[in-house]
Design a protein with these regions (language model features):
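Short acidic/glycine- and proline-prone juxtamembrane loop motifs at membrane-interface regions
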Residues: 206-214
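Membrane-interface helix-loop-helix junctions at transmembrane boundaries of multi-pass membrane enzymes
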Residues: 176, 181, 231-237, 277-279, ...
C-alpha cells in the first residue's frame, strides 16, 4: 500500500466526519453536541488517521523485533498517559473516576466488597454471592478478575486500569501475529499500527467495564487457535491454552465463547488438506465437539440456551421496546432491517440526545463506521483472489458474532459491537493492502452513503422523540 493511497484514504475519512458533524450541527443546531464532545470526537478521528498515515510508512520496513518494540511501547505509552488523564478528567467532570454511573461503579463496588471478605478469610460469603449473582456466569469473569486485583492491591482503580493498558498494548502484537500469519506481512503491520491508534482501544483503558479484557481474550484465543493449526505443533500446552481462553471468555460474554468454538470448527473444515489432513480434521473436530459438550453440560450450557432463545426468538425486541416508550419509527429497528448494516452499525451519534458514554466515543464510532467498508471489501477481495479459506477463522468469528448481536436486544449498543472492532481493522488492513484502483469507485460511493446515513441516523434519533 503506497504512502499516497493511505494518505488519501485518511483525508477522505477526516473529510466525511468533519462534513457530517458540521451539517448535523448546523441543521439541528438546537440539539447539536456540546463543544466538549465535538472536541473529543475531532481529536479521536484526527488521532487515528493522522498518526496511522505518518507512522505506518516509517515503520513498515523495520526489522521484526524493532517493529514489535515500536508497536508495543508506543501503544503502552499512549494508554498509560490516557489512564492518568482520564482518571483526573472524570474525577473533575463527574466527581468520581468513572465515565458513567452505570456498570462501572457496580463492578467496582461489588469487587471491593468481595475482596474485603476474602482478606477476612470468609470464602463462604464469596461463593454464596457468586451463586446468587443475578447477572449469571457470563458476568463472573470480570467480577472475579477485579476482586483478585483489589484483594492484592487494595481498592484503588489504578492497578486495574494499568492492567487494561498492558492488555491493550499487547493486543496490538497479537493482532499483528494473527493478521500477518493469515494475510501476509504488509497486512499484519498495517493492522498493528491501526490497532495502536484505534481510539476505542485506548478509551477502554480508562473505563471500569469488561470490554477491554473481553476483547483481549477473544483475539488472543483466535490467534492461538490459528497458531495451533498453521504451526502443526500439537503440544499439550498449544491445545489446552486456546481451550482455557475459550472457557474464560464464557465468563465475560457467553456469545464470545460460542462464536470462538464455531469459528474454530469452520476453520478446521475449510482448511486445505496441505494445512490439515483428513485425519487431522477428524481428530480436531472430535476434540472441538468434546469441548463443546463439556461446556454444554455445565452452567455455561444453560446460558448458551438462553442466548439462543434471546437471539432467535426475540428479533423484534428493540422495535417493541421503542414502541412502548412512545418512540416513532420503531419498525426500523427490527433485526431484518439492521442485518445488512451489521459491520457498520451503530452509526456515530452527533446530537445531544445520546448517552454521555456514546458522546465520548462518537469519534471512535465513526472510525469503525468508516473502516467497515474495507472490512466488507476484504471478503470480496478474498473471494476474488481465491484465498477465502485462509480467511475462514476470522470471518467465521466476525460474521457469527455480528449476526448474533444484530438479532438480539443489543444491536443498537456500541458496547456490544466493540469486540468486533479489532477484526474490522484486520480485515480492513487486508483490503487496503490488496485493493485495486477500480475498488476506489466503490469507496467513493461508500463515503457518500456514509455521509447520508450519518445525517439520517441522527435525524431519526431526534424525530423518534418528536423533537424535529
Amino acid at each position: 500500500m503506497s504512502k499516497k493511497l493511505i494518505r488519501y484514504i485518511s483525508f477522505c475519512g477526516i473529510g466525511v466526519y468533519l462534513l457530517a458533524l458540521f451539517v448535523v450541527s448546523v441543521v439541528f443546531r438546537d440539539h447539536a453536541l456540546e463543544w466538549e464532545w465535538m472536541l473529543w470526537g475531532i481529536g479521536e478521528v484526527l488521532f487515528f488517521f493522522v498518526l496511522t498515515t505518518v507512522l505506518y510508512p516509517r515503520w513498515k520496513n523495520d526489522e521484526h523485533k524493532l517493529f514489535w518494540r515500536k508497536v508495543f511501547w508506543t501503544a503502552l505509552a499512549i494508554r498509560l498517559l490516557y489512564v492518568v488523564f482520564s482518571y483526573y478528567y472524570f474525577s473533575f467532570r463527574m466527581g468520581q473516576p468513572f465515565d458513567s454511573p452505570g456498570d462501572a461503579i457496580g463492578y467496582y463496588n461489588r469487587s471491593v466488597v468481595l475482596s474485603r471478605y476474602i482478606r477476612k478469610g470468609d470464602f463462604g460469603f464469596v461463593v454464596n454471592f457468586l451463586k446468587g449473582y443475578s447477572l449469571g456466569f457470563s458476568d463472573h469473569g470480570y467480577l472475579i478478575w477485579l476482586t483478585f486485583i483489589h484483594t492484592i492491591f487494595g481498592r484503588s482503580v489504578w492497578v486495574a486500569r494499568i492492567f487494561k493498558a498492558l492488555m491493550s498494548a499487547y493486543l496490538c502484537i497479537v493482532v499483528y501475529k494473527l493478521s500477518s500469519r493469515t494475510f501476509g506481512e504488509r497486512t499484519g503491520r498495517l493492522a498493528a499500527v491501526m490497532c495502536v491508534f484505534m481510539p476505542i482501544l485506548i478509551l477502554l483503558t480508562g473505563m471500569h467495564v469488561k470490554e477491554m479484557e473481553m476483547i483481549f481474550l477473544s483475539i488472543l484465543a483466535l490467534e492461538r487457535m490459528d497458531y495451533l493449526i498453521r504451526s502443526k505443533k500439537y503440544t499439550l500446552w498449544n491445545i489446552l491454552f486456546p481451550i482455557l481462553l475459550i472457557g474464560m471468555s464464557f465468563g465475560f460474554r457467553t456469545v464470545i465463547g460460542m462464536c470462538l468454538i464455531f469459528a474454530f470448527f469452520v476453520f478446521v473444515i475449510l482448511s486445505p488438506n496441505n494445512l490439515v489432513s483428513r485425519k487431522g480434521k477428524i481428530v480436531s473436530l472430535s476434540v472441538t465437539l468434546a469441548v463443546f459438550l463439556v461446556f454444554l453440560f455445565t452452567v455455561i450450557g444453560s446460558e448458551m440456551k438462553i442466548v439462543y432463545m434471546l437471539n432467535f426468538s426475540g428479533t423484534d425486541y428493540l422495535a417493541r421496546k421503542y414502541e412502548s416508550l412512545g418512540l416513532k419509527y420503531s419498525e426500523i429497528s427490527k433485526s431484518k432491517y439492521l442485518f445488512p448494516g451489521a459491520f457498520v452499525l451503530p452509526l456515530s451519534p452527533m446530537v445531544d440526545v445520546a448517552p454521555l458514554h456514546n458522546k465520548l466515543i462518537h469519534g471512535s464510532t465513526f472510525v469503525k463506521n468508516f473502516m467497515a467498508f474495507f472490512a466488507m471489501l476484504s471478503i470480496v477481495i478474498a473471494v476474488r483472489q481465491r484465498k477465502w479459506r485462509n480467511f475462514s477463522l476470522i470471518w467465521a468469528f466476525e460474521l457469527s458474532y455480528l449476526t448474533i448481536v444484530v438479532f438480539t436486544f443489543t444491536s443498537n449498543s456500541e458496547r456490544y459491537h466493540e469486540p468486533a472492532i479489532p477484526l474490522i481493522l484486520v480485515m480492513g488492513a487486508y483490503a487496503m493492502t490488496h485493493m485495486r484502483h477500480k475498488d476506489l469507485k466503490l469507496f467513493y460511493v461508500y463515503c457518500g452513503l456514509l455521509f447520508v446515513a450519518l445525517f439520517v441516523w441522527n435525524w431519526l434519533k431526534l424525530a423518534a422523540r418528536g423533537i424535529v
